[in-house]
Amino acid sequence: MAHAPASCPSSRNSGDGDKGKPRKVALITGITGQDGSYLAEFLLEKGYEVHGIVRRSSSFNTGRIEHLYKNPQAHIEGNMKLHYGDLTDSTCLVKIINEVKPTEIYNLGAQSHVKISFDLAEYTADVDGVGTLRLLDAIKTCGLINSVKFYQASTSELYGKVQEIPQKETTPFYPRSPYGAAKLYAYWIVVNFREAYNLFAVNGILFNHESPRRGANFVTRKISRSVAKIYLGQLECFSLGNLDAKRDWGHAKDYVEAMWLMLQNDEPEDFVIATGEVHSVREFVEKSFMHIGKTIVWEGKNENEVGRCKETGKIHVTVDLKYYRPTEVDFLQGDCSKAQQKLNWKPRVAFDELVREMVQADVELMRTNPNA
């Protein structure tokens, strides 16, 4: 049943024992998304008071944080509150920030689907680009420049048509989508506020990161869901776009820790977060099928290519040109050596483990709820 944002009672003792402790209050945009839900969990475990901004909709999409929202007693200390708001509404952002007075803001909210950004270019620019400016301006309006730390979810899509391999903090940007271009504006306005107003503001240039909580319209989750359905006999075949696109894939749970570490750093700096390993969409498909005991062999070329099950002879994968982007990003590989050195961060979950976790989770999900 949908329920409106409201404060959850906390198990934290708010008596004299808390006096003298520094305030740990986080505000997260995009809290209902993959990264936001993992970050909320992470911060609650660290004793933060967590506030999230959610958009009003007829279907209240809090599925990824429902376990936190309903049962805050599971945490030793800390609590959570959700607020209606939108990155396109300056007034509500000022109101929420002034009320919450956060010590850390994590801007994860975005129209984050690259392919869809070609169809919703203006909206993507408004939310992902100008929305970041609205948040930064709200911090300034509320007089919190000297008391808040700001994390901006930047993206490897900034590199687009890559200018060097691997990509690091100093690699020139060349975005290849409205999403990448909007995020480029957000990146530079964060740098500008840091330099102009001395705001502790950082960009986390995160390469692709996945999990069982990944949105169903992203390629990795589309693969894991489809493979699970094939395993359960609910589906025979699914279509993909560019099988040879290569990405640096990590686990979202590892990457939210890096976000937090950036705000605990002595100085505000931008960091690339990645695994340094590259795998193709084709490999993701092959690994996924391996976890259900099937071997995929490829036949044909380009849009006529198919993935056939070696054991049964059935075609399970086809290529559809409609899933190609107008301008493709063929290869992304991150160099996170700066984060390893300065933040002592490194990825924990290996590619094979990530794929297995996603397929297993979707097998369980599709078994209990085929229409999920």
Curated annotation (Swiss-Prot):
It comes from Cricetulus griseus (Chinese hamster). The gene is GMDS. Keywords: Acetylation, Lyase, NADP, Phosphoprotein. The modification N-acetylalanine is found at A2. Inhibited by GDP-fucose. It comes from the Eukaryota. One of its GO terms (molecular function) is NADP+ binding. Pfam families: GDP_Man_Dehyd. Its EC number is 4.2.1.47. This is GDP-mannose 4,6 dehydratase. InterPro entries: GDP_Man_deHydtase (IPR006368), NAD(P)-bd_dom (IPR016040), NAD(P)-bd_dom_sf (IPR036291). Residues 1-22 are annotated as: Disordered. The keyword Acetylation applies. Its cofactor is NADP(+). It catalyses: GDP-alpha-D-mannose = GDP-4-dehydro-alpha-D-rhamnose + H2O. The modification Phosphotyrosine is found at Y323. NADP(+) binds at residues 30-35, 55-58, 86-87, 108-112, 123, 183, 209, 214. Catalyzes the conversion of GDP-D-mannose to GDP-4-dehydro-6-deoxy-D-mannose. Gene3D superfamilies: NAD(P)-binding Rossmann-like Domain (3.40.50.720), UDP-galactose 4-epimerase, domain 1 (3.90.25.10). Pathway: Nucleotide-sugar biosynthesis; GDP-L-fucose biosynthesis via de novo pathway; GDP-L-fucose from GDP-alpha-D-mannose: step 1/2. CDD domains: GDP_MD_SDR_e. The active site is at T155, E157 (nucleophile), Y179 (nucleophile). GO terms for cellular component: cytosol. GO terms for biological process: 'de novo' GDP-L-fucose biosynthetic process; GDP-mannose metabolic process; Notch signaling pathway. Belongs to the NAD(P)-dependent epimerase/dehydratase family. GDP-mannose 4,6-dehydratase subfamily.
